[in-house]
Amino acid sequence: MLPEDYAILSQYVDILPCNDVSAVDPFTGLVLNINVTTLAHRDPADEKICLILVISDCEGSVELCFIETGLVLGLKLGDVVIFPSTKLTHFNAHFRGYRVSLVFHSDKHFCRWVEDNNGWVGNSRLNTDARI
């Protein structure tokens, strides 16, 4: 992961509501994909980058494809890919057997929480300093 991307993403998890911690630091979101095949897409709501971790051992490999670059990555159990999901059109190919992956990402709109707690800064009804 690039240091500047890490710095941007980690500022979000450093100020989670109620001083909570993220189990997927420096990301704030986690998706569990079970037997998922996707159409070609970009993720416009993601912040900077996403990380994909393959956690199954399916027949053959998991093929992650990128339209703009023409790259087809044959991923196996334990492989990790980090890429800018807002900029690269991507999809995963059809497969046989079972396929499971974890996708780590952060929502780009989390920057509003960094700026002013989504408009709640100074509100007595929301204590961002206390743990629940």
Model segments located where?
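Conserved, ordered domain cores of eukaryotic regulatory proteins
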Residues: 1-46
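Catalytic core of Fe(II)/2-oxoglutarate
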Residues: 46-48, 57-132
